[in-house]
């Protein structure tokens, strides 16, 4: 990388390129010490960079800047689950190394291979492909989620990756804690939704590897197939129906990397994208799930997403976000809380 200006190379928010280059050259055979990095747009929390030494390219992930919930940005867990899933039917990038020393780039981080594929964020991007291809892509997305939930955690070394017993109750408590720690305004529906969720937690429907943020713009697509599932920062062992419910809430509200308030502009609003009923039918055909208490799961998913977006809104107000779109993060929070309450009305508990 001769001729690269050091001051320019170091002007990448969240990375010390000299330190990172030295670490990469020691950890990855053939990697050079002088690297450049580009922040990949689209990430709402953990920061993702494309790093190159001029010969090879890698993806580096580190936690966000500033006010964060530590357990939601545990790089070691994200690295572990992807490493475990290599060789299974679930497409994940090959992991190359991790570092717990915050002295290298300012926080723990890990490195993985760069996988070919496109991350689709908007309806316009899918409309350019046509309805038939959009239907194929969205079908593959649901099939991938179903396949993930059929993986037996113990078979891939993840038997101790979480505590599935009491998962739903802990989720209710966890997102209340995050929302309380990030709230910047009066949100009366938040208190009511939490109270109703906490008062009627069902027994878990099953145990599986929960991704925690499964949606189209968290996968890569090549030739209409899923080539990689990304953003495992919330992964754990728990109730798989929580992933399905969150996918549907994302679809209803059009939430994705753009954090836009209009579902019509989100990728899941594109012509040909499988409908909610089709998503549920396809998923249940793969997993043989029981949807008796699905209203609770939808209410919890809406509460979780509201807490996540309010946390992003808080970081934006504090000047601790990197990238575009964060000024819109808080717009959907009140509507999500209201939708969560509506979902509980349809619960069969």
Predicted regions and their residues:
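Catalytic-loop of the protein kinase fold
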Residues: 209-211, 216
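Juxta-kinase regulatory segment immediately upstream of eukaryotic protein kinase catalytic domains
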Residues: 2-31
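Activation of the activation-loop gatekeeper triad in protein kinase-fold domains
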Residues: 230-235
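All-alpha amphipathic helical-bundle segments outside canonical DNA-binding/catalytic cores
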Residues: 162-163, 289-301
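ATP-binding pocket architecture of kinase catalytic cores
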Residues: 34-209, 225
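Active-site activation/catalytic loop segments of kinase-like enzymes and analogous catalytic loops
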Residues: 242-287, 301-319
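Helical subdomain adjoining the active site within ATP-dependent kinase catalytic cores
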Residues: 289, 293, 307-349
């Amino acid at each position: 990388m001769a001729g690269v200006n050091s001051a320019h190379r170091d002007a990448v928010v969240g990375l010390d390129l000299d330190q990172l280059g030295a670490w990469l050259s020691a950890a990855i055979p053939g990697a050079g010490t002088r690297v450049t990095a580009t922040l990949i747009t689209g990430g709402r929390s953990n920061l993702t960079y494309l790093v190159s030494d001029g010969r090879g390219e890698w993806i580096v992930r580190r936690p966000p800047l500033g006010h964060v919930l530590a357990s939601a940005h545990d790089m070691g867990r994200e690295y572990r689950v992807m490493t475990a899933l290599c060789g299974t039917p679930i497409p994940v990038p090959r992991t190359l190394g991790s570092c717990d020393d915050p002295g290298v780039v300012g926080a723990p981080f890990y490195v993985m291979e760069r996988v070919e594929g496109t991350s689709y964020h908007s309806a316009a991007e899918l409309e350019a492909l046509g309805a038939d291809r959009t239907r194929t892509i969205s079908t593959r997305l649901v099939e991938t989620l179903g396949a993930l939930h059929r993986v037996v955690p113990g078979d891939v070394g993840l038997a101790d990756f979480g505590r599935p017993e009491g998962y739903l109750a802990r989720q209710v408590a966890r997102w209340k804690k995050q929302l309380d720690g990030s709230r910047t305004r009066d949100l009366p529906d938040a208190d009511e939704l939490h109270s109703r969720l906490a008062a009627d937690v069902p027994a878990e429907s099953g145990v599986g590897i929960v991704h925690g943020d499964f949606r189209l713009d968290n996968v890569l697509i090549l030739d209409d197939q899923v080539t990689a599932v990304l953003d495992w920062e919330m992964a754990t062992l728990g109730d798989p129906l929580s992933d399905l419910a969150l996918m549907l809430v994302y679809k209803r509200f059009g939430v994705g990397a753009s954090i836009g308030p209009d579902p019509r502009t989100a990728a899941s609003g594109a012509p040909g994208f499988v409908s909610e009923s089709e998503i549920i039918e396809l998923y249940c055909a793969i997993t043989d799930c029981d949807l008796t208490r699905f209203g609770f799961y939808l209410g919890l998913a809406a509460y979780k997403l509201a807490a996540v977006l309010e946390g992003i809104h808080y970081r934006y107000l504090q000047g601790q976000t990197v990238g575009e779109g964060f000024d819109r993060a808080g717009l959907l929070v009140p509507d999500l809380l209201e939708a969560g309450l509506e979902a509980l009305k349809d619960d069969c508990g």
